[in-house]
Amino acid sequence: MVRKTVYTLVVIVLQMGEERVVFAREKPEVSVQYTIELQSDFGRRLNWVNLLSLRATVPMEWLGLWGNGKLEVQAISVYKTSRERIAGDRQVFSNIEEDNLPFSPFILGYSQQIGKVLLFGGLRNVNEDYFTTPYASLFTNSSCGIYPTLSANYVLANYPLSAVCLHLEYRINEKIGIKNSLYNGKAYLPFERGSSIFTVAPRRDGLLDLAEISYTTNNSYHGTYNLGVVVHGSNRFGDASDCRLPSEQVQAQTEVSSAKHWRVNYACWLSAEQECWRSGRYSAGVLGQYSFAPSDRNDCRRYVAAGGVFRGMLSASQEDALGVIFSQASFSDVREKALEITWNYTVSDHFTVQPAFHFIRTGNERYHIAMLRVVVSY
């Protein structure tokens, strides 16, 4: 009788242990984010921009296979009411405004964690891994999300474009990390005749590689410092407008250029964010950004920005952030200065509201923009 009781208890414990293992497995995750943005140049013109993002991750362990790996899928759709932008600024004051785009693959690939190393292969975009620091992510100007020394000089996988990529991340320790991303040298618009976002053509498009080392402070004050470089090699140089050319036209231009001359282009960047003060719910910090590219082969040669972020100033909790940033971009034909003042308030875990004001001077042209962004996510 005693043996039977002990045996029964052992079976129960083993079954409970098995259940714990099952419940500990990662489950698939699905998220939806809808962003609405209203833009106005103070009464003359209006624009309404919509961005819908659907994302899913499926752990391999959930499929009964190995651990620490997952399939990643994300699709986006963009719609706006005005075909023309309400401002002619070069840096682009809205980081979500693009031409209308039906659902398009944004991320599609497989990632594997091996110790301190993360590997990814598939369709990807640079917005997933670079220029995503906490302070910079607050602002709505496109230059804060990716510097114009990259977005204006390369046809790279920048929102809403994606390209085939091999991505690697390595955490040296809790403070220092390294990233490297190797992309096809040109990103293509989806659903365009004669082009494919899954194109891998180094001979025609070249190769584009991004590398970055980051340092994060591990004390009570948040701080992030990044140093990066992008290198592009191909038979021809292009700019961001090339993404609207069909691949046949790009091929023809490539054949005209000498195949014997493999040309290299590059840009470097440096960014710093540091929280400087904290008292109760209040906190304040500063950020700085700088990037340069060779002036003899690029449209945008210099970019510099500086600003501050203040939390808890306008609400009873730290669910709000007030940001001010000034940026200057030097292009081959004009210099542009932009000032953004924005406030982001998190109403709930699923709802945020963010008004922003942009004051821009592009050469002799001036633009004043007011916008309201609302984000709903689940």
Residue ranges and their predicted role:
Residues 49, 103, 161, 206-208, ...:
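Membrane-spanning beta-strands of outer-membrane beta-barrel proteins
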Residues 30-32, 71-75, 119-121, 168, ...:
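Membrane-embedded beta-strand positions of outer-membrane beta-barrel proteins
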Residues 53, 58-185, 298-307, 311-333:
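Outer membrane beta-barrel
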Residues 193, 197-202, 212-214, 228-262, ...:
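Outer membrane beta-barrel transmembrane domains
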Residues 1-25:
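Cleavable N-terminal export/targeting peptides
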Residues 21-29, 42-43, 57-71, 116, ...:
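Short loop/turn motifs that connect adjacent beta-strands in outer-membrane beta-barrel proteins
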Residues 366-378:
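Outer-membrane beta-barrel "beta-signal"
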Residues 23-41, 71-73, 81, 142, ...:
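Transmembrane beta-strand segments of Gram-negative outer membrane beta-barrel proteins
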